[in-house]
Amino acid sequence: MENINNQEQKNEKVADNIISERKQQIYQIEDRIDSEKNKLNKISDIEDNFIALNKSLNRCIELVSSSVKSKKNTYMYEDMRISNNTLLNRVSNTLDEERDAVNKNIKNLYSEKSKIEDEAKEKE
């Protein structure tokens, strides 16, 4: 009888350890999800700041070009404006790619978390 009780206690201990391990895995995944969400916020901040900078630079180009009237300068300022907008598009595209990668990571992490939770429910 004592052997049966000892075995039951060992089994309970093993089960408790497994549950504890799964909870720890879930907490780690949730931390990684939060970290990825912070990355998304930083990407949005970078994009907002870059767009504001781009608008300011375009406005400066506009002001300078309106004060200096010569064909040569007009072309130069137009080239600057085009170059500035091209750079904005490149940065925006790069940030979009980063955002997509982070969103994919978040989706995978949620999937991994669900898998662990489902396995835990099956074994209960």
Where are the model-predicted features located?
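Long, charged amphipathic alpha-helices with heptad-repeat/coiled-coil character
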Residues: I26, R32-I43, L95-K123
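Extended aliphatic helical segments
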Residues: V14, I18-I19, I26, I43-I46, ...
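Short, glycine/alanine-rich amphipathic alpha-helical segment
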Residues: R59-D100
